[in-house]
Amino acid sequence: MEINGIAHTFVTVGDFDLSRAFYSKLLPFLGMKNVMDIPGTYYCVGGRTGFAIREAPEENRGDGFDQNRIGLHHICFRARTREDVDEAHAFVKDLGAEIVHGPEEAMWAPGYYSILFEDPDGIRLEINFVPGKGLLK
């Protein structure tokens, strides 16, 4: 069997209204279309995947995100060009995201180029570009 990508990712957020305001701008910028917007859930699809935020139960909202705990470390969205990464950097800065690093190359694959930033809960999000098939060639 060979998988055909990641079908969807759900992220649990502490302040749903704040996170919805953030993701309802970010995800459409990334070409994703909203398909569900109900109390406690905001879900978009596009680029052969889905991405959703869900409200944390009240008793868990104070815990906060820590990428070094067991579980999620970060999420990376794949861009089609280096210029897309540069454009995304300007967009997320204007959105008020905490920038971890601006556009830069990294050793993960030949031509790997990315930005890294945080959502309102401190969940790290990356947007990268890798030319050609990258490590899959």
Language model region names:
Residues 1-20, 75, 131-137:
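N-terminal beta-strand motif that seeds the catalytic metal site of vicinal oxygen chelate
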Residues 7, 26, 30, 49, ...:
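Long, contiguous binding/interaction regions
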